[in-house]
């Protein structure tokens, strides 16, 4: 009996890790180092912390799980999740925990497998989109380069714009009487 409980806990742990690894908000935080130089280690620790949280609290409500995950992401990764994924991930974790409590290893395996497959599809799509975006940016860069080397009256400017010279030096100076006590400057029309 202890072996079955150990197997179910290992399956629950794998499911928690799969759900967290497939969570885009967490992955963005990890990839961009929002948790500091140890973001990868914090993400692994997060899986264990979530598992322990469920093991210590048998009757968790969905909002309690959301609050716990939100607090961990805020404290450890300086990330506030506002994309609507927090309730989804919380629901997945809670469903997995219910399967764990019933000892339904097959359902745990199926959920973890489904989450992993979905993550692979999203990753493949994201890579394809990123490559297309890079190609589009190359096109924009070349257009911008052409604009920078445009000529002005037959002479190349190389992206440097000549500064206009003031026409009347007296018009550019600010008179002391135009400065008000609050630090504001009164602007008057040219005569």
Swiss-Prot record:
Name under which the protein is recorded: Pre-rRNA-processing protein TSR2 homolog
PANTHER family on file: PRE-RRNA-PROCESSING PROTEIN TSR2 HOMOLOG (PTHR21250)
Pfam families: WGG (PF10273)
Disease: Diamond-Blackfan anemia 14, with mandibulofacial dysostosis: A form of Diamond-Blackfan anemia, a congenital non-regenerative hypoplastic anemia that usually presents early in infancy. Diamond-Blackfan anemia is characterized by a moderate to severe macrocytic anemia, erythroblastopenia, and an increased risk of malignancy. 30 to 40% of Diamond-Blackfan anemia patients present with short stature and congenital anomalies, the most frequent being craniofacial (Pierre-Robin syndrome and cleft palate), thumb and urogenital anomalies.
A GO biological process held by the record: maturation of SSU-rRNA from tricistronic rRNA transcript (SSU-rRNA, 5.8S rRNA, LSU-rRNA)
Protein family: Belongs to the TSR2 family.
InterPro entries in the cross-refs: Pre-rRNA_process_TSR2
Role, per record: May be involved in 20S pre-rRNA processing.
GO cellular component, one term: nucleus
Gene from which this protein is expressed: TSR2
Chain residue ranges for the region called Disordered: 149-172
Keywords of the record: Diamond-Blackfan anemia, Disease variant, rRNA processing
Protein source organism: Homo sapiens (Human)
């Amino acid at each position: 009996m202890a072996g079955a409980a150990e197997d179910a806990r290992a399956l629950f742990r794998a499911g928690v890790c799969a759900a967290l690894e497939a969570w885009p908000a967490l992955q963005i935080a990890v990839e961009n180092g929002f948790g500091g130089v140890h973001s990868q280690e914090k993400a692994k620790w997060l899986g264990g912390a979530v598992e322990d949280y469920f093991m210590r609290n048998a009757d968790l409500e969905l909002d309690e799980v959301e609050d716990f995950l939100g607090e961990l992401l805020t404290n450890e990764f300086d990330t506030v999740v506002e994309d609507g994924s927090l309730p989804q991930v919380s629901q997945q974790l809670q469903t997995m925990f219910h399967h764990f409590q019933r000892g339904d290893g097959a359902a745990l395996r199926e959920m973890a497998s489904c989450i992993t497959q979905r993550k692979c599809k999203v990753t493949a799509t994201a890579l394809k989109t990123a490559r297309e975006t890079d190609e589009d940016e190359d096109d924009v860069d070349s257009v911008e380069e052409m604009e920078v080397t445009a000529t002005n009256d037959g002479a190349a400017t190389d992206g440097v714009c000549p500064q206009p010279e003031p026409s009347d030096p007296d018009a550019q100076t600010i008179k002391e009487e135009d400065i008000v006590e609050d630090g504001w400057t009164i602007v008057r029309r040219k005569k």
